[in-house]
Amino acid sequence: MTDDKVILVIGATGAQGGGVARHLLNSGRFTVRCLTRNPSSEKAIALQEAGAEVVKGDFGELESLKTAMKGCYGVFGVVNFWEHFDKTYELGKNLVDAVAASNIKHFVFSTLPNAKKISGGKIEVPHFDIQAKLEEYTRGLGLNVTFVNPAFYFENFLSYFPPKKQEDGTFAFGFPQGDTLLAGVAIEDLGGVVTAIFNKPDDFKDKQLV
């Protein structure tokens, strides 16, 4: 049974947001509201059938974000760099500004560390560095926020980097290369982490979970 706390999930039809929405729904403790540009999509309909409230909205429209956040206790947000590229920062800033204007009690924001800063300027990873810039902006607003930094998705081996069958019948992965170590996560499990944060937000305030 829910405790009437409404959590808005941004990006609920994507890999991260979908897992978060499903875990929140399965916990039975929250009312889950999912923002999507296309409420009639197959994934949006599946979320609605699972018990979520699905609303139409767009990162590019600040007012639509604020409308979706009305009455919400918390927000989970992620901005997909690979979908938005050079608009990622602008759209992410819209999201953060909407949270700041909406009396949200706790914000969970999926970001990434600053590769350029960590490497002393030797390495630039655009999708990391833009997300880190969004995190820096968010910290400056004094919000009740927790940052989550998910690792490489194991699910990528089922899509972007599938194993290739060799002549001897075995399968080989082409990534990572050589002896390189690769941290990974089943992205569905991120939902469990985010649900735990919303269950005990004071324990995770201003923290970064990697």
Where do the protein language model's features map onto the residues?
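Oxidoreductase cofactor-interface core, primarily capturing Rossmann-like NAD(P)-dependent enzymes
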Residues: 2-46, 60-70, 79-90, 98-106, ...
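Short, conserved active-site loop motifs that form the nucleotide-linked donor/cofactor pocket
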Residues: 51-52, 145
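Short acidic/histidine-rich motifs immediately flanking catalytic phosphotransfer sites
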Residues: 50, 70-74
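Cofactor-binding loops of NAD(P)H-dependent oxidoreductases
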Residues: 57
